[in-house]
Amino acid sequence: TSDRIVDVTHPTGDLVAQHYLPTTADVETAVAAAWAVRAEAATTSAAKRAAALMHVSNQLQARHEEVARIITDEGGKPLMWSRVEVSRAVSTFRWAAEEARRFSGELQRIDTDAQSEGRIGVIRRFPLGPVLGVAPFNFPLNLVAHKVAPAIAVGAPIIIKPANKTPISALILGEILSETDLPT
């Protein structure tokens, strides 16, 4: 971890939190860790991925007001809109949980001419490697959710870089994800 500290401040100027900026070595460690769990993440069952995603959705719902207030504190968004953002993230994780069960392959007929009569093609979908997500400040939870949830749904490790000025809601999401059985 670097010695460069970033202040997270409310638009009123009140200090909300502080965090360290990552070093190049921190980023390299994260990338190496993501590649190291790639095979395990890709072979994690759809049921297990869906359960983890539902856990996140349920925990965000249970902590709805707390997370909304954090979004307001860290970014100055009106509380009403922060609540909407948390609701959207809850829905995003729920949708991803449903999609995790549908992420599979398919069979297609490829008998388009006489030489291929009776043949089928197998289409198999699988993650190619880790995903890197960079999230902006204006929707610090929902736009992180839109990157993290689909990556988990398909079995891809993800490294997320939240905005420096609004990282707390992403950290809460990481905390909730750490409660699951997903590979880390």
Residues of each region from the PLM?
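Glycine-rich, flexible loop/turn motifs
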Residues: 4, 37, 75-77, 99, ...
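A general secondary-structure boundary signal
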Residues: 5-7, 68, 175, 179
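Terminal low-complexity tails and localization/encapsulation signals of metabolic enzymes
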Residues: 1-19, 51, 55, 87, ...
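Rossmann-like NAD(P) dinucleotide-binding subdomain of oxidoreductase/dehydrogenase enzymes
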Residues: 108-184
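Glycine-rich loop-to-alpha-helix module at the N-terminal edge of alpha/beta enzyme cores
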Residues: 13-104
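Serine/threonine-rich low-complexity intrinsically disordered regions
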Residues: 7, 23-26, 40, 111, ...
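N-terminal hydrophobic or amphipathic segments with adjacent small-residue motifs
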Residues: 6-7, 28, 70, 83, ...
